[in-house]
Amino acid sequence: MRTSGRLLLLCLAVGLLLESQAHPNADAGDATRDVGSDRTSVELSKMLKGWQAEKGQRKASAPKKFYVYPPVRRSFY
């Protein structure tokens, strides 16, 4: 029981260490950086909607595929 407790504590410590390395804290440069205006977001949204509409039109105008299967021969002995 004592060994399993130590192993659990070790795994917890390693997990916390890895978690802290995965998400570094933001520094002052990241906090003050301009990430974009609302206008940019609106323009991006419009562009995405346009691309989705074009994709939908391409799918609608695409010819439907059909398959021709050869006749099945059944041989009876």
UniProtKB/Swiss-Prot annotation:
Chief localisation class: secreted
GO cellular component terms? extracellular region
Q: Which molecular function terms from Gene Ontology are attached?
A: toxin activity
Compartments in which it is found = Secreted
Chain residues in the propeptide: 23-58, 73-77
Membrane-crossing segments per the record: none
Kindly state which keywords UniProt assigns to this record, in alphabetical order. Answer: Cleavage on pair of basic residues, Secreted, Signal, Toxin
**Signal sequence range:** 1-22
- Tissues in which the UniProt entry reports expression: Expressed by the venom duct.
Q: Does the keyword Flavoprotein apply?
A: no
**Is Secreted one of the keywords UniProt gives this record?**
yes
Q: What does this protein do?
A: Probable toxin.
Tell me the protein family, please. Answer: Belongs to the conotoxin H superfamily.
Q: What is this protein called?
A: Conotoxin Vc1
Q: Which organism is it from?
A: Conus victoriae
